[in-house]
């Protein structure tokens, strides 16, 4: 049987690498011993010799010093402006990040609720406000079992929307305590940065996936959607279809004016080029059966690994008849390339 002998120096090195969380939060210096009594010196034995009287100028005063509370030496946490064109700060009670309102579809309470559910954190969502159950902080430098109840709120005003995170309660090892200002800033900012960071990473990954998948051709057939409207059923998932449609619609003289990917909606402006426009072969020579100049909407719905696109006019009526046939056949041809 082989015996493994570890040098003492190696074992000592491993022991030296172990750092307790107490040392991460509290300084181990003379400040911790500030309540120690000052030294007293007994009078010198003069042996009959007359000595000059002691000068009290530099005598240390005997003052009773009361040691203050333990000081948390961890660096403060601050909200980070992770979102482009955003502003982040701590206002004394809440950590907040304000961002352009057009990003509200990505950074909102519904997305925050999804993250909390994935993390196994219980919550109640009412009136644009989330109140969580007790949740671990997720920090590696905690002493004991520290848990927090958070309040997360979304507010929109003008051209901006904002997410707020505040601390409702804190407890350590099942003992509830009142957080100091530094605690409120640290834990509210930490949770806000974590939530917004994950939402931002998820959004960027979705954009990359959309850009990468949009190059592949898509096969499609004419059918109906779940509401019985004439639709083009695409043999591709939502993300792939969304990107590909964004590439081919301008080729059919549709300008994309606005889009909300979270709802699968695009607002389009159609400006036909005349009798030689793409729809001319499907109508009469004068082109009277073609689409008219105006605003249209594209609605894309997910159907498992497939998706369906429906084109509607400005009043929300789905295109039908010769107009739908012409448009969807043109889309079929371009999507398959």
UniProtKB/Swiss-Prot annotation:
Q: Does the keyword ATP-binding apply?
A: no
Cellular compartments annotated: Cell outer membrane
Task: Give GO BP annotations, semicolon-separated.
Answer: Gram-negative-bacterium-type cell outer membrane assembly; protein insertion into membrane
Any single Pfam family the record assigns to this protein: Lipoprotein_18
Keyword tags: Cell outer membrane, Lipoprotein, Membrane, Palmitate, Signal
Lipid moiety (N-palmitoyl cysteine) attached at 17
Signal sequence bounds: 1-16
Subcellular location, principal: membrane
InterPro entries found in the cross-reference section: BamC, BamC_C, NlpB/DapX
Q: How does it sit in the membrane?
A: Lipid-anchor
Output the superkingdom of the source species. Bacteria
Q: Indicate the family of this protein.
A: Belongs to the BamC family.
Q: What does this protein do?
A: Part of the outer membrane protein assembly complex, which is involved in assembly and insertion of beta-barrel proteins into the outer membrane.
Quaternary data: Part of the Bam complex.
By its UniProt entry, which HAMAP family does this protein fall under?
Answer: OM_assembly_BamC
- Could you tell me what this protein is called? Outer membrane protein assembly factor BamC
């Amino acid at each position: 049987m082989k015996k493994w002998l570890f040098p003492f120096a190696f074992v000592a090195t491993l022991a030296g690498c172990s750092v307790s969380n107490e040392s991460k939060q509290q300084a181990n210096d003379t400040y911790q011993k500030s309540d120690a009594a000052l030294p007293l010196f007994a009078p010198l034995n003069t042996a009959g010799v007359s000595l000059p009287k002691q000068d009290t100028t530099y005598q240390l005063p005997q003052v009773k010093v009361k040691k203050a509370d333990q000081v948390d030496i961890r660096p403060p946490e601050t909200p980070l402006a992770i979102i482009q064109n955003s502003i982040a700060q701590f206002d004394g009670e809440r950590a907040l990040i304000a961002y352009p309102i057009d990003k509200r579809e990505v950074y909102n309470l519904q997305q925050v609720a999804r993250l909390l559910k994935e993390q196994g954190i219980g919550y109640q969502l009412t009136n644009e406000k989330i109140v969580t159950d007790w949740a671990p902080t997720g920090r590696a430098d905690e002493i004991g079992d520290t848990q927090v109840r958070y309040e997360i709120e979304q507010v929109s005003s003008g051209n901006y929307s904002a997410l707020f995170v505040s601390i409702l309660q804190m407890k350590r090892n099942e003992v509830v305590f009142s957080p100091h200002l530094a605690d409120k800033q640290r834990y509210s900012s930490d949770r806000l940065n974590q939530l917004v960071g994950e939402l931002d990473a998820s959004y960027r990954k979705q954009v990359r996936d959309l850009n990468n998948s949009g190059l592949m051709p898509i096969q499609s057939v004419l059918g109906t959607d779940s509401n019985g409207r004439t639709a083009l059923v695409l043999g591709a998932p939502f993300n792939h279809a969304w990107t590909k449609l964004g590439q081919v619609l301008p080729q059919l003289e549709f300008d994309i004016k606005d889009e909300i990917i979270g709802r699968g909606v695009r607002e389009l402006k159609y400006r036909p080029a005349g009798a030689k426009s793409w729809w001319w072969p499907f109508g009469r020579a004068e082109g009277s059966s073609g689409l008219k100049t105006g605003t249209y909407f594209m609605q894309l719905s997910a159907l498992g690994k497939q998706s369906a696109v429906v084109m509607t006019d400005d009043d929300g009526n789905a295109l039908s008849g010769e107009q739908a046939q012409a448009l969807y056949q043109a889309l079929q041809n371009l999507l398959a390339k």
